Amino acid sequence: MKLKIYTLLIAFCAAWSLHSCDNDDDESIAVPAALQEAFSSKYPNVKNVKWETKAGYYVADFYDGYEASAWFTMDGNWHMTETDIPYTALPDPVKSAFEASDYKTWKRDDVDKLERQDIETVYVIEVENQNQEVDLYYSADGVLIKSVADTDDHESDHLPTTQLPATMKTFIDGKYAGARIVEVDVEDDKNDWNFGFTEVDIIHFDSGLNRNVSKEVLFDKGGEWYSTSWEVRRNELPAAVTNAISVEYAGYQMDDAEYFEMATGTSYYQIELEGNNSPDIDIKVTADGTILK
């Protein structure tokens, strides 16, 4: 009987150790020599380091002026460093953009600096208002890249980005000259229509708008360009678009607007309309004021 119990305990412990290896914060984990050398080379002045494993990466938690976490693969290849910084340490353009945004009155919860392999540094301001929490992603020059509802699922927060295929990089360089890549993600929700598509966020100077714009470039499962979209301010909408809406949708107010370039050759504005006593609706309008049905 004792032997059976002992055997069961061994089996349970083995199963538990396998289950926990995806997120292991045991200080005794073995860190390969190549990884130790890579970390010391990148952060030569850091002394006290605590290693853990997350999502298949080795993560070094340390203090170097601020609390930080550096993500590596087993062979010593660096992928990301996340640094917890005070609001005052943000670049001035980021602070100015935030303080002029719709979120300026929200409570600031946390600020992170994300440095990742082969892409631009991104700053994330976590804000909350009553039961709502939002992560605001900014480039160093103050362009709002995206706003994401915070689900408190910290296991998936700020993971290293997907490696961008060379063919996609070449396409972006050709179509959007001078663009800076700030985010790469593959849609993994099987319930979404674009499951398996690659989303690439870029900062691109738009000569028509005469400003830097955050654009989302979408590639299909085969790696072919599918579409590019970006937010448009109301005062940037063509007069033909606003006139068509005022005629066809009297009583509605324009809210958010996005511009879409499609690989099919069509382009249009997608505009959210708010009605006083009617449900909100989304419409598509071409630059000449044609409303697409």
What feature does the model see in each segment?
Residues K2-Y6, I10-N45:
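Bacterial Sec-dependent N-terminal signal peptides
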Residues S28-K293:
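First exposed extracellular module after export/assembly in secreted or surface-exposed proteins
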